[in-house]
Regions:
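Active-site cores that bind ATP or allylic diphosphates and position pyrophosphate for catalysis
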Residues: 1-48
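A structural signal for isolated positions on well-ordered beta-strands in alpha/beta enzyme cores
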Residues: 131-135, 163-165, 184
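Conserved Lys-Pro-Asp/Glu-containing loop-to-beta segment of HAD-superfamily phosphomonoesterases
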Residues: 165-196
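Short amphipathic alpha-helix with an adjacent loop that forms part of the alpha/beta core around
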Residues: 174-179, 216-227
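Acidic, Mg2+-coordinating phosphoryl-transfer loop and its flanking beta/alpha structural elements
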Residues: 184-222
């Protein structure tokens, strides 16, 4: 359905504008996200790699929606209490308008930091033994500029990661190129997780403004269980 497709792509702007708004819209969006999350868990359980047992994965954190509050930045830019207020006018393409406004600017460097960001990083470091990396998508049509300001946000808001990847094809990092070990992606968009899994990686669907850190902890524990079973 159209609702499922928009939710799968993480396109909340379009979901609330095209499908419905208010509490009913949020409830439907959350139901779809939960179902997609169950599918992702099932796909992770099917993961098999004979090289997993003696190797440590790279854990990649997405930036927007996971560490940085993209929609909080939109609210600040428009001067509204909640971004969903902007979806009331169905005559305009809100996504295009927002992209046009932030293209070529320092928008990504100004994003609010989620309160859970540092705890999330600590959770990942505890799992890996002290390492974490960033894998984030650039703004389409503004790759170099958006990458610059995303890296600035990272340097200003969190401890330095082991690696910062800015790419429109996250799934190319799904497996270690040397050992074949499945790497882990923590991302708020189901479509990114699905592509990651299709490329042989392990995905954890996590949206900072709706999920608790327990979801990440359980996901990491699930990876460890797969390792033990090999």
């Amino acid at each position: 359905s159209k609702a499922r497709d928009l939710a799968n792509k993480g396109q909340e702007f379009e979901f609330y504008q095209v499908i419905m708004g208010g509490k009913t819209g949020k409830k439907l969006y959350d139901i779809i996200q939960d179902r997609l999350g169950k599918q992702i868990d099932e796909n992770n359980n099917k993961l098999y790699n004979e090289d997993m047992k003696d190797t440590t994965p790279t854990v990649y954190l997405d930036m927007d929606g996971v560490l940085a509050d993209f929609f909080g930045g939109v609210e600040k830019m428009y001067g509204v209490e909640h971004w969903k207020q902007l979806t009331n006018d169905k005559t305009k393409d809100l996504k295009k308008e927002v992209i046009d406004r932030i293209t070529g600017t320092n928008f990504f460097a100004t994003l609010p930091k989620f309160d859970s960001a540092d705890s999330l990083i600590d959770t990942v470091k505890k799992f890996t033994g002290g390492n974490f990396s960033i894998n984030t998508s650039p703004l389409r049509g503004d790759h170099e500029n958006s990458a610059k300001y995303k890296k600035l946000w990272i340097s200003n808001n969190i401890e330095q990661p082991d690696d910062i990847v800015v790419t429109g094809r996250k799934e190319t990092y799904a497996k270690d190129k040397g050992t074949g070990t499945p790497n882990i992606l923590i991302d708020d968009r189901p479509v990114n997780i699905q592509r990651w899994q299709a490329a042989g990686g392990y995905g954890i669907l996590y949206q900072a403004n709706r999920d608790s850190l327990d979801k990440v902890k359980k996901g990491l524990e699930g990876y460890a269980e797969i390792q033990r079973d090999q």
